[in-house]
């Protein structure tokens, strides 16, 4: 990079940074995007090996239709990235004998109302009796009647406390708890009811399970390609070392590849690494620093990448859960103390079942995972990986016979790739800040930092929703904020 003076610098080409940079360039700002890795995508990065194309761990998004994913592509003049697979997903729940049984769903069509027959089949699969069904109907009816104002009043109530009003059947509660774990990667008795209900409405109206042609990370690679065509400058393998601040005003970024000047910096590195390391505590008041240090991350995913000698699963992704395997606060605390659960919730994604081009003919890659603490140095990882192997074979007999090779991954891998550890036991989180009570809605950290010209983008500020969709939502919102700031101060 020969030039070093820009209108704005975006740190990180993840699901928040890459779309935000593209939108800024489209708006006419001379923008630099720096990324410490050799490609875009962040936690949703897509890689290639031995003919397989896959993410480093399971990634799907939502909503599937009318999404911010498709909106960013349209804004950049790009074609839809939505895959056209057939068998969408399967959920597995144990019967009375402890044998996991499947409930399979085909790829949903857009603008299709809920199917009452399918809903009843799901209740039968869960073993819900008539009394339980009445409680579920009352819960669903009253929740559907909530206005946006009503939902906003639930920022300080956990989803567990909200649903506990209805005396729901245990299997149905377990399914809701599983959804809290998979969509938000936090315990059901911590997730804010407002966030859960608002995002669930988006999913109900437009389905879940978004995946991009060419791999999930391909969506963000395309954003960067468009960014470059719009005149943006990209620096891969460029690690931000310091955000330069003088007299309360951003001046630029110091990196391993030189120093770049700009009056605006947008950080996709996470609010805690940005404040505590890239900027430095000395530039903020003590109350703000304490608030940032107190922010709680989501839980993490750890697991195994299995490379199979033949296709084993037909569905594009699946989730196996039970009354004993979803993660609540009590179970999470036991795991943080080093206990390996007897029963694990399992989340698998099969990229080539979304897009057949992502695996060699006659083979399959299975990205398997379970929830765990976010500590990059969590203990007993080998025991967790062995437990995952055992759960995979127990739930899906014959699976292990198809495994040609495998690779394990854990919280240290996540932290090293995407989020530097700046506080004890934090850094390996799956999403970023947890969407828990005290950190959602009116309590969400502001995207504009208390330093002139500094903004946060991604899952930590500026958006709402499910994982990567929250990050892209943030990209739109923060790009608008930055454009306005530039107009006022440029």
Residue ranges and their predicted role:
Residues 199-250, 255-256:
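Helical element adjacent to the flavin cofactor pocket in flavoenzyme catalytic cores
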Residues 308-416:
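C-terminal segments that line or cap access tunnels to active or ligand-binding sites in enzymes
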Residues 6-33:
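N-terminal Rossmann-like FAD-binding beta1-loop-alpha1 element of flavoenzymes
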